[in-house]
């Protein structure tokens, strides 16, 4: 197996570990899905690029309504609470029209009631979209330069030990599993977006990338563009492929999409 293919298979393995569980995954839709995608800057690049990647994969009927706001303003609960904003009205209009097959949102920062925003939107969406699926994109931990120190503060060696705990013990246990129990007829699954940045950062540190990529710097040639960890293009491409596999079930090992990088994502 070549180094390029080995690198690409990392994300196939990640999806097997971190995305939906058996019988809780996406349904296969040969021609594409009609989507409403809402979030912030750790969600937006993947949602926008998904239109390109889905078209390349042959999903001719793929379409999406995209609504974004920065930071916590892009959380599900924030959109819901800001009920008269132009962005929230756009979301409601898209759901009111019916026929939406996937409603994807970013992870919410409401720690006191972590399912509140998601439940509000699911309740709103269901009457006109009874067959809707719900996808929750789980971003990486921000400020990557501090990853290991933050992990060690919680008793873990590094981000690779901490992040699975965040996914399983926080997001799946406290949010996704709760929503699944409350809405047993709705297909609800996670999209492990954050693994793209975490894995590529480690590959860059270990000199396993087949491109000249810095850890921090310009978007076309770096993993991250700033200290907070906003995505360079290689992370956007890898993360979008994770979205494609999570939403459409595509086998990334045989996907022919040209990411523009020598490294097989």
Task: List PLM regions with ranges.
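Sec-dependent bacterial lipoprotein signal peptides
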Residues: 1-18
């Amino acid at each position: 197996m070549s180094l390029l293919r080995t690198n690409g298979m990392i994300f196939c393995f990640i999806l097997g570990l971190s995305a939906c569980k058996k019988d809780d995954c996406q349904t296969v839709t040969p021609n594409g899905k009609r989507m409403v995608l809402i979030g912030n800057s750790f969600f937006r690049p993947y949602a926008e690029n998904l239109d390109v990647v889905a078209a390349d994969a042959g999903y001719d009927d793929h379409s999406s309504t995209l609504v974004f706001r920065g930071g916590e303003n892009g959380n599900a609960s924030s959109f819901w609470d800001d009920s008269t904003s132009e962005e929230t009205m756009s979301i409601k209009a898209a759901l009111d029209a019916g026929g939406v097959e996937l409603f994807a949102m970013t992870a919410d920062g409401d720690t006191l009631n972590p399912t509140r925003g998601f439940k509000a939107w699911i309740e709103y969406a269901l009457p006109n979209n009874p067959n809707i699926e719900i996808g929750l994109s789980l971003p990486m931990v921000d400020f990557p330069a501090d990853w290991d120190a933050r992990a060690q503060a919680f008793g873990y060696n590094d981000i690779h030990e901490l992040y699975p705990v965040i996914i399983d013990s926080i997001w799946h246990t406290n949010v996704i599993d709760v929503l699944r129990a409350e809405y047993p007829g709705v297909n609800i699954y996670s999209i492990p977006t954050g693994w793209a940045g975490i894995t590529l950062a480690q590959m860059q540190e270990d000199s396993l990338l087949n491109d000249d990529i810095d850890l921090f710097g310009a978007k076309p040639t770096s993993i991250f563009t700033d200290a907070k960890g906003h995505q360079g293009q290689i992370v956007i491409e890898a993360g979008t492929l994770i979205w494609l596999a999570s939403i459409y079930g595509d086998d990334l090992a045989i996907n022919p999409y040209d990411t523009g990088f020598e490294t097989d994502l």
